[in-house]
C-alpha cells in the first residue's frame, strides 16, 4: 500500500515541521517503502547500486558537499541525482536547497520537502512513521487484554467464552484492548501490536447468561 507525499504532509506536517518546496502537484508522488536513505556517492557521480525507490534525505553534509563544488558541477550533480525516479527528497534543518534543485525537481515531478528537524532526529521520526504505515497487518477474531504490559489474545470459535475470560481479567485490574475484532500489526523485530477498531472502541460484546 503506497502513501502519497500529500497524505504524509496532511498527517505529519506540524509534528515533523514539513513544508513542500516544489509545486503542489508533485505531492501526488507515492512512497512505497519504509526505507529512508541519503544519496551518498550518487552526488559524486557513482550511481551503481543506487536505491532510488527509497525516500532520500539531504542533510548538512550533503548540502555542504554540493556547495563545495563549482556552480556547474553542483548543477550537474543535482541533475544526475534527480534523473532517477525518486519518491521524495527531504532537506533537514530547514536548510536551503542547492541552486536549481527545486526547478529541476518541478520538471521531473519529484517533491522536495523541507523539515525543521535535525537530520538524526528526522531519520528516527520519519522511519517510525513509515514503518507503522507499511507494517504487515491482519484482523483476527478474538479478545485482547493487556496483562501487566503484555498482550494476551484469546481466540477460538464463537460462544466459548473469550469475552468472559477478558472480562474476568478486567475485574482483576487488567485492561481491555479489543473485543471481537483485533487489528494485529507486525513491527520490526517481529513485535506484534494489537488494537481494536474505531467502531467498537473499548466496548465489549457479551452474551447474557
Range-by-range predicted roles:
Residues 56, 144-146, 153-155, 175-177, ...:
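Structured core elements
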Residues 54-57, 87-90, 110-113, 151-153, ...:
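Structural motif
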Residues 80, 104, 168-169:
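Hydrophobic/aromatic ligand-binding patch that stacks against planar heteroaromatic rings
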Amino acid at each position: 500500500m503506497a502513501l502519497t507525499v500529500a497524505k504524509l504532509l496532511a498527517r505529519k506536517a506540524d509534528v515533523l515541521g514539513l513544508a513542500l518546496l516544489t509545486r503542489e502537484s508533485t505531492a501526488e508522488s507515492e512512497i512505497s517503502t519504509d526505507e529512508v536513505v541519503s544519496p551518498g556517492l550518487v552526488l559524486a557521480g557513482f550511481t551503481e547500486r543506487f536505491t532510488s525507490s527509497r525516500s532520500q534525505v539531504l542533510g548538512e553534509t550533503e548540502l555542504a558537499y554540493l556547495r563545495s563544488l563549482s556552480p556547474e558541477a553542483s548543477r550537474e550533480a543535482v541533475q544526475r541525482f534527480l534523473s532517477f525516479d525518486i519518491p521524495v527528497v527531504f532537506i533537514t534543518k530547514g536548510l536551503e536547497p542547492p541552486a536549481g534543485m527545486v526547478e529541476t525537481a518541478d520538471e521531473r515531478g519529484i517533491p522536495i520537502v523541507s523539515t525543521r528537524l535535525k537530520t538524526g532526529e528526522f531519520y528516527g521520526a520519519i522511519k517510525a512513521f513509515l514503518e507503522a504505515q507499511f507494517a504487515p497487518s491482519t484482523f483476527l477474531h478474538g479478545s485482547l487484554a493487556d496483562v501487566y504490559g503484555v498482550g494476551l489474545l484469546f481466540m477460538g470459535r464463537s460462544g466459548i467464552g473469550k469475552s468472559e475470560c477478558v472480562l474476568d481479567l478486567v475485574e482483576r485490574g487488567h485492561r481491555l484492548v479489543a473485543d471481537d475484532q483485533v487489528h494485529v500489526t507486525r513491527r520490526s523485530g517481529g513485535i506484534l501490536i494489537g488494537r481494536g477498531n474505531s467502531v467498537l472502541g473499548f466496548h465489549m460484546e457479551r452474551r447474557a447468561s
